[in-house]
């Protein structure tokens, strides 16, 4: 049985991403993750980056909650959002942008996050804002330390690095807390701390984004084997992504195993299980709608790993969840979830499909293993 990090005692706080999608389920009160050390960059904030009334700024951040706080903070400039759930579903790097957005919109619609047309419109709007970066004096990227944000960051930097920006300055704020939690005053105080994006950061982001979208996940391991210090939170995020590959020991992703472990420890309600699994994360990145999708997969098989009452698609606050005998066997490493049900899962550019997974995560070795 693969090891999990111990659960922490956390303070409850609202962590609504408000991604711009119409989630099918109500949001719950979530828990905050522990704070990681603030990143340090070699390039100090120079005087020409300090905002002046006549400078045109574009702020790009991870969701409507953070965007609203930036607007309330009084900082000058326009605000845009980029908030795709890149840690879920197909993200093949070989597709041109228009086709890529359609693939993403189809996944988001099929998963119940939004209807296809609305999702496609949002994805297109977010990209168009980045593509217009050259019309601003400065573009400020506001992102957090978790997997959700780090994937958004490397995609944004990859897109921006491919544009002719002229004299536009790119700067970056990497928060060690969740931006949606911050007060407008604290958000305004972060702006002078922003750092100019250098060539090392652009180069690393492009390499990492292309590795994420590759059908060969060993390219991610190659990125991790190199110097990731220009983006201090990227290493942890990419490792967390690799942990979503089915494990050698039991065929479970880390997220799936955390759910079974929470149930084994006595959690029963949706909220209890959700909060328990958030407590097992070093950096929280998954919302309740995404979590609900995993529950549906664990329950939707003739030999399910969990049972739910009154039903997995019922009201979330009414759900009661329990481990099945098969779930206990898989959690104990006595059976294998992939071999029970097969697999059809996209992780970035990797499509795991069939009765066996082509790639698995070996937690003991800290690396991928061919299936």
Each language-model region and where it sits:
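Charge-enriched amphipathic alpha-helical scaffolds
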Residues: 278-312
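Short capping segments at the starts of secondary-structure elements
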Residues: 262-272
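A structured, charge-rich N-terminal accessory region that forms the first stable segment of a protein
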Residues: 32-116
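A conserved mid-domain beta-alpha-beta active-site/ligand-binding segment of alpha/beta enzyme cores
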Residues: 187-264
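Short, conserved secondary-structure transition motifs
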Residues: 171-194
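Long, hydrophobic/aromatic-enriched structural stretches that serve as scaffold segments
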Residues: 111-162
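C-terminal engagement modules used by replication, chromatin/transcription, nuclear envelope/ESCRT
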Residues: 301-371
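A short acidic, leucine-rich amphipathic alpha-helix
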Residues: 272-278
């Amino acid at each position: 049985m693969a090891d999990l990090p111990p659960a922490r005692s956390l303070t409850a706080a609202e962590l609504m991403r408000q991604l711009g999608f119409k989630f099918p389920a109500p949001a719950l009160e979530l828990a905050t993750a522990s704070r990681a050390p603030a990143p340090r960059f070699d390039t100090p904030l120079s005087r020409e980056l300090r905002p002046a009334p006549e400078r045109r700024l574009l702020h790009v951040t991870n969701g409507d909650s953070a965007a609203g706080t930036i607007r309330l903070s009084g900082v000058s400039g326009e605000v845009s959002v980029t908030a795709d759930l890149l840690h879920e579903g197909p993200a093949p790097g070989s597709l041109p942008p228009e086709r890529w957005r359609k693939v993403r919109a189809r996944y988001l619609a099929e998963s119940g996050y939004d209807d296809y047309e609305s999702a496609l419109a949002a994805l297109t709007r977010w990209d168009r804002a980045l593509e217009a970066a050259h019309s601003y004096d400065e573009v400020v990227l506001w992102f957090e330390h978790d997997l959700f944000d780090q994937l958004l960051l490397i995609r944004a930097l990859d897109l921006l690095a491919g544009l002719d920006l002229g004299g536009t300055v790119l700067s970056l704020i990497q928060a060690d807390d969740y931006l949606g939690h911050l007060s407008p005053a604290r958000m305004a105080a972060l702006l002078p701390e922003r750092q100019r994006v250098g060539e090392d950061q652009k180069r690393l982001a492009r390499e990492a984004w292309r590795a994420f979208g590759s059908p060969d996940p060993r390219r991610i391991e190659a990125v991790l084997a190199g110097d990731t210090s220009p983006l201090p939170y990227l290493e942890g995020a990419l490792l967390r992504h690799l942990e979503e590959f089915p494990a050698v020991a039991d065929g479970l992703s880390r997220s799936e195993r955390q759910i079974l472990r929470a149930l084994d420890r006595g959690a029963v309600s949706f909220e209890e299980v959700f909060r328990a699994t958030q407590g097992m994360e070093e950096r929280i990145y998954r919302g309740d709608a995404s979590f609900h999708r995993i529950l549906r997969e664990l329950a939707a098989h003739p030999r399910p790993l969990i049972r739910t009452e009154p039903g997995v698609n019922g009201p979330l606050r009414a759900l009661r969840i329990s481990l099945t005998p098969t779930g206990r066997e898989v959690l104990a490493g006595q059976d294998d979830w992939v071999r029970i049900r097969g697999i059809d899962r996209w992780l970035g550019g990797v499509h795991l499909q069939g009765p066996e997974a082509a790639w698995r995560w070996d937690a003991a070795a800290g690396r991928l293993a061919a299936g």
